[in-house]
């Protein structure tokens, strides 16, 4: 039997279960900044459930805690400090200016 007629077989990979990102003793609260900061991107956005590997209930509680921390000014709404930094100076024209009337 040639290769084109053989049934397709998937190669078996070893499956290693990852540890849950939130332990049973962790309390999801707006004051627990070490826990909350793990679920926020560099821009300050809330990461999705698929990225966080959380259950629906955990993701909902994390989202509420992050929003409460933002309202109480414990977290910024946006994290774009790089927006106001200038890396290069922009050359400006220093010659005489003429107006068109």
Curated annotation (Swiss-Prot):
One of its GO terms (molecular function) is structural constituent of ribosome. Residues 1-23 are annotated as: Disordered. PROSITE patterns: RIBOSOMAL_S18. Its main location: plastid. It is found in: Plastid, Chloroplast. Keywords: Chloroplast, Plastid, Ribonucleoprotein, Ribosomal protein, RNA-binding, rRNA-binding. It comes from the Eukaryota. InterPro entries: Ribosomal_bS18, Ribosomal_bS18_CS, Ribosomal_bS18_sf. GO terms for biological process: translation. GO terms for cellular component: chloroplast; mitochondrial small ribosomal subunit. Residues 1-19 have a biased composition (Basic residues). Part of the 30S ribosomal subunit. Belongs to the bacterial ribosomal protein bS18 family. PANTHER family: 30S RIBOSOMAL PROTEIN S18, SMALL RIBOSOMAL SUBUNIT PROTEIN BS18M. This is Small ribosomal subunit protein bS18c. It comes from Lemna minor. The lineage of its organism: Eukaryota, Viridiplantae, Streptophyta, Embryophyta, Tracheophyta.
């Amino acid at each position: 039997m040639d290769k084109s007629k053989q049934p397709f077989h998937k190669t078996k990979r070893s499956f290693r279960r990852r540890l849950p990102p939130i332990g049973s003793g962790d309390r999801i609260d707006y004051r627990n900044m070490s826990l909350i900061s793990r679920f926020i991107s560099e821009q300050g956005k809330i990461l999705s459930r698929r990225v966080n590997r959380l259950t629906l209930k955990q993701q909902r509680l994390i989202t509420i805690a992050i929003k409460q921390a933002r309202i109480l000014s414990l977290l910024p709404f946006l994290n774009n400090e790089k927006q106001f930094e200038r890396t290069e100076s922009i050359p400006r024209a220093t010659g005489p200016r003429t107006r068109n009337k």
